[in-house]
Each structure stands twice: as C-alpha cells, then as structure tokens.
C-alpha cells in the first residue's frame, strides 16, 4: 500500500447531484466536515459560492491543495459537464480554473466514481489484486 497519501493535508470535496461535503484533511485524517444539500439552481457560479461558503464555515484560511470528486464528466483540463441535468443544469464549467483562481491554490478535479475506484485500487482492499472492477 502506498503510505505517502496518509501524510497529506488539504481540502477534500465530494460534490454530488443531491449533496456536497467539504472536509479538512490534516496528515491524512479527516478533521472537520460539513455536508449539506447541493444548491439546485443550475447556475454554475452558485456552485463555486457554495464550496467557498463551506470552506469558510470550516474556518480554513489557506490550503496547499483542493481535491474534488464530482458527479458527471470531467475532461483532461478540469472542465465539468454535469450529467444530472434535472438537478445541476446543462453546461460546461471550467471548474479547475475557477477553483484555482478563487482559492489561489492547486486543485485536482475527478469524476466521483473514478475517484472511488482509484482509491480502492491503490489504498483499499483492491490493492492486493492485479485487476479491479468497481460498480457504483
């Protein structure tokens, strides 16, 4: 198992169609988490504001890294394309660029199911296997 990750600190965000969780991670441990319903207004900038509000509510002043696992498609440039158009709208949002500009820090944006599969394969029970299938 790759132990390097367990010394990492930053902000982890789980952004789904119905809920958003923002967590502060210090040396690989979840210290504080806020979870609330996702704002269902289909306006891209409001999602950024919701993330910002939750980070402020956790009293986090600065972080070297923000990681976001998000529902929908994410391209290689960090652009987000929601697939749940009923709740999230139908648009392309340059999420990586907006997050990095807003918080002046590096970010990683990845599809939530991909994040779960990679986490399980590299750090969970799947680590011991050569191949892994993952169903959400």
What are these language model-derived features?
Residues 1-9, 56-57, 61:
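Short, Lys/Arg-enriched, disordered terminal segments
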Residues 2-5, 124-128, 135-136:
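Solvent-exposed alpha-helices and their adjacent loops that cap or buttress functional pockets
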Residues 5-46, 81-82:
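Short glycine-rich, Thr/Ser-proximal phosphate-binding strand/loop in the N-terminal lobe
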Residues 8-14, 65-67, 131-136:
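Short glycine-aspartate micro-motif
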Residues 18, 71-74:
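Short glycine-rich anion-binding loops that position phosphate/pyrophosphate groups of nucleotides
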Residues 25, 63-68:
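Short coil-to-beta-strand
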Residues 39-52, 64-66, 74-131:
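Glycine-rich phosphate-binding loop and adjoining helix at the ATP-binding site
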């Amino acid at each position: 198992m790759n132990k390097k990750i367990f010394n990492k600190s930053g902000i982890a965000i789980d952004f789904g169609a119905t809920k958003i969780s923002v967590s502060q991670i210090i040396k690989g441990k979840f210290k504080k988490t806020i979870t609330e319903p996702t704002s269902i207004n289909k306006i891209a900038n409001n999602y950024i504001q919701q993330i910002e509000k939750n980070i402020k509510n956790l009293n986090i002043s600065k972080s070297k890294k923000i990681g976001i696992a998000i529902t929908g498609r994410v391209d290689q440039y960090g652009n987000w394309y929601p697939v749940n158009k009923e709740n999230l709208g139908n648009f392309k949002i340059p999420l990586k660029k907006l997050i990095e500009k807003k918080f002046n820090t590096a970010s990683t944006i990845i599809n939530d199911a991909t994040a779960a599969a990679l986490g399980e394969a590299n750090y969970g029970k799947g680590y011991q296997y050569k191949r892994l299938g993952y169903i959400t």
